[in-house]
């Protein structure tokens, strides 16, 4: 069974349709896949610990645009590398400017931009070699090398012992060993001289005059007093103009991402307020029985508010008004005669 890990950026949590779409694509390709999802901040802060050699695929979901907004800490890349099995793949919204960090963590960058965990290379094993055994008298024994002592080189000329049978043979051996030593000394002395001559190389001879003639040296953005410019000049050739343009684009990208987050949060708050307005309490005529006594057919708690002050309670809102019928508009027009 294939195990897949979804690493969600915090902004991807607000877009439920995006996460649902990715899960449906996974289920269409791998119906028996075991999908686990975590927010990448919790993994980076080690609140959630991932087990080593567990997941076959890790999919990183980050809806933000721009390489700056998709960068991953090197420590997080190492955690993801350890959680993958051999030949495991990390794919999704990966930053293309962090391929070197991925390679340093152990990944291999694929042709489609995916990061692949390679198989472990087998360790080298040292094989001990047995010494050659020499059979002596039917039994194998380990023999040490034997050495022969050289005779003195200051032998008297013309004085030989004719009684010895092997005198000429010994002289031939001594002469051949002398020649061998002389040839070895001559060989090594000549080779040392040649090495010393080869090691001393003038670096100026490696550069031809044709190449140095057409070199273009960029002009430094410096003021006459030796101080550097704060801003790039009009015809900048030292690269300061490109650095400023990159900084400006990074700032604008960061501002756009912050504004997008603010817009998304404002939309969520507006939706919550609309839902609260839909659930607001509204009263109908039946619910206003104890509130508005002028509605026809409605009576107060004492059922005598319309009869007059003699029948009204102490806290009745109609104290001082003449008797009326329920539903009748009460108007007072006779105050002009008393004035």
Swiss-Prot record:
Pfam families: CIAPIN1 (PF05093), DRE2_N (PF16803). GO terms for biological process: cellular response to oxidative stress; iron-sulfur cluster assembly; negative regulation of hydrogen peroxide-mediated programmed cell death; negative regulation of nitric oxide biosynthetic process. A motif (Cx2C motif 2) lies at residues 313-316. Keywords: 2Fe-2S, 4Fe-4S, Cytoplasm, Iron, Iron-sulfur, Metal-binding, Mitochondrion. One of its GO terms (cellular component) is cytosolic [4Fe-4S] assembly targeting complex. InterPro entries: Anamorsin, CIAPIN1, Dre2_N. Residues 221-238 are annotated as: Fe-S binding site A. It is found in: Cytoplasm; Mitochondrion intermembrane space. [2Fe-2S] cluster binds at residues 221, 233, 236, 238. One of its GO terms (molecular function) is 2 iron, 2 sulfur cluster binding. Residues 158-206 are annotated as: Linker. Its cofactor is [2Fe-2S] cluster; [4Fe-4S] cluster. A motif (Cx2C motif 1) lies at residues 302-305. [4Fe-4S] cluster binds at residues 302, 305, 313, 316. Residues 1-157 are annotated as: N-terminal SAM-like domain. Belongs to the anamorsin family. This is Fe-S cluster assembly protein DRE2. The gene is DRE2.
């Amino acid at each position: 069974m294939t195990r897949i890990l979804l690493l969600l950026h915090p902004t991807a949590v607000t877009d439920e349709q995006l996460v649902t779409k990715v899960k449906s694509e996974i289920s269409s390709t791998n119906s028996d896949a075991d999908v686990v999802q975590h927010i990448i901040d919790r993994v980076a802060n080690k609140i959630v610990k991932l087990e080593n050699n567990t997941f076959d695929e890790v999919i990183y979901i980050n809806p933000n645009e721009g390489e700056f907004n998709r960068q991953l800490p090197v420590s997080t890349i190492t955690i993801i590398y350890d959680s993958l099995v051999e030949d495991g793949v990390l794919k999704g919204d990966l930053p293309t400017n962090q391929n070197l960090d991925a390679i340093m963590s152990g990944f291999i960058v694929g042709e489609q931009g995916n990061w692949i965990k390679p198989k472990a290379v087998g360790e080298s094993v040292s094989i001990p070699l047995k010494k050659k055994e020499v059979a002596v008298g039917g039994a194998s024994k380990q023999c040490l090398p034997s050495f022969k002592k050289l005779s003195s080189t200051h032998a008297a000329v013309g004085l030989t012992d004719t009684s010895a049978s092997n005198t000429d043979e010994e002289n031939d051996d001594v002469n051949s060993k002398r020649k061998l030593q002389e040839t070895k000394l001559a060989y090594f002395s000549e080779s040392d001289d040649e090495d010393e001559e080869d090691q001393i190389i003038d670096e100026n001879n490696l550069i031809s005059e044709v190449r140095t003639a057409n070199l273009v040296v960029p002009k430094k953005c410096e003021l006459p007093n030796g101080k550097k410019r704060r801003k790039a000049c009009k015809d900048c050739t030292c690269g300061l103009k490109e650095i400023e343009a990159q900084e400006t684009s990074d700032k604008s990208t960061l501002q756009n991402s912050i504004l997008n987050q603010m817009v998304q949060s404002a939309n969520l708050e507006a939706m919550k307020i609309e839902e609260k307005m839909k659930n607001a309490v509204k009263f109908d005529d039946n619910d206003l029985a104890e509130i508005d006594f002028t509605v026809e057919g409605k009576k107060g708690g004492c059922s005598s508010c319309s009869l007059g002050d003699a029948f009204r309670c102490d806290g009745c809102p109609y104290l001082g008004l003449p008797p009326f019928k329920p539903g009748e508009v009460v108007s007072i027009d006779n105050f002009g005669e008393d004035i």
